[in-house]
């Protein structure tokens, strides 16, 4: 069992596992994964925290959202889910797509979100600005998945396991266990899941970027302690400095670079759990 001692629940169509006792922390997964990416970190944190790990709307066992995939909408859904679980204020940590939801929740609900952790991602607005010239090759999926329906859906449906498996295999410095990989693929290959994932990326290309731009124009910044972690790029020359990007949004920022691939919660769970614990001491 990947989450010993955790309860499995469904709240308003959102599949969620939760367990532990202590200050509440919400852990959000990325693409093309599910709550399982947090299995090691969550069980460690449950010694000191009330840990909540949902499948994002449209991912895994969670139903697609009725009101679209804007991160503002998903963030509000997560806040409502946590309130339904009895948590009016909490910390939030996200990886990849989940970090974008966490970022939006922290900007939109600063009275609710007390601590923010973001893993291996930069905000949507900054990401689009960085993907210029040949740098766009590394983020090709951002452009593909954001194309109008149903072009990418049809392309991916021709061989979804190869498509999603490409990211699971090539973004990881250490292989994802075969049973976990199979679960991710099973949750992503259905027509409903493929469409939901594409809608998630379409939102990032348009409405999410607009929301970020409006916040930047208004001078809004993150008011809580923020932890930003990312993989060591090694010999890859990133088209941006993650620390500089996040410092522009977060006055109270700490950063960590880990020697691993993209999937930090799976590849370096002990380091991630330790960093989260430190975040909550600030």
Task: Enumerate the predicted regions with their spans.
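Flexible "cap/lid" subdomain of the alpha/beta-hydrolase fold that forms the substrate-access gate
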Residues: 2-10, 14-17, 24, 52, ...
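Conserved strand-to-helix beginnings and helix N-cap segments that scaffold or border functional pockets
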Residues: 38-39, 239-240, 269-270
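Catalytic histidine-centered segment of alpha/beta-hydrolase-like enzymes
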Residues: 261-269, 273
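Alpha-helical elements of the RecA-like P-loop NTPase motor core of helicases
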Residues: 36-39, 195, 274
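A short, glycine- and basic residue-enriched loop/turn
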Residues: 34-35, 100, 261
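Conserved HGGG/HGGXW glycine-rich cap/lid loop of the alpha/beta-hydrolase fold
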Residues: 17-61
């Amino acid at each position: 069992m990947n989450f010993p001692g955790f309860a499995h629940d469904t709240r308003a169509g959102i599949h969620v596992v939760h367990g532990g006792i202590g200050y509440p922390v919400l852990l959000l997964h990325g693409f093309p994964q599910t709550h399982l990416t947090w299995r090691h970190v969550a069980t460690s944190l449950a010694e000191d925290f009330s840990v909540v790990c949902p499948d994002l709307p449209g991912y895994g066992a969670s139903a697609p959202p009725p009101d679209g995939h804007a991160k503002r909408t998903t963030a509000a859904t997560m806040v409502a889910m946590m309130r339904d679980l009895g948590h009016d204020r909490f910390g939030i940590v996200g990886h990849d797509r989940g970090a974008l939801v966490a970022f939006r929740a922290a900007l939109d609900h600063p009275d609710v979100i007390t601590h923010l952790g973001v893993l291996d991602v930069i905000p949507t607005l900054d990401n689009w600005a960085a993907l210029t010239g040949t740098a766009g090759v590394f983020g090709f999926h951002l452009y593909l998945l954001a194309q109008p329906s149903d072009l990418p859906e049809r392309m991916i449906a021709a061989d979804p396991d190869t498509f999603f498996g490409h990211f699971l295999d090539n973004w990881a410095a250490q292989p994802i266990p075969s049973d976990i990989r199979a679960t991710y693929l099973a949750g992503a290959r259905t027509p409903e899941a493929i469409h939901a994932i594409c809608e998630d990326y379409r939102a990032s290309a348009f409405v999410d970027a607009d929301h970020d731009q409006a916040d930047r124009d208004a001078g809004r910044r993150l008011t809580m302690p923020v932890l930003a972690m990312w993989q060591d790029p090694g010999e890859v020359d990133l088209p941006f400095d993650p620390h500089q990007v996040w410092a522009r949004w977060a006055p109270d920022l700490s950063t960590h670079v880990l020697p691993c691939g993209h999937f930090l919660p799976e590849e370096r769970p002990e380091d991630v759990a330790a960093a989260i614990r430190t975040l909550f001491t600030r």
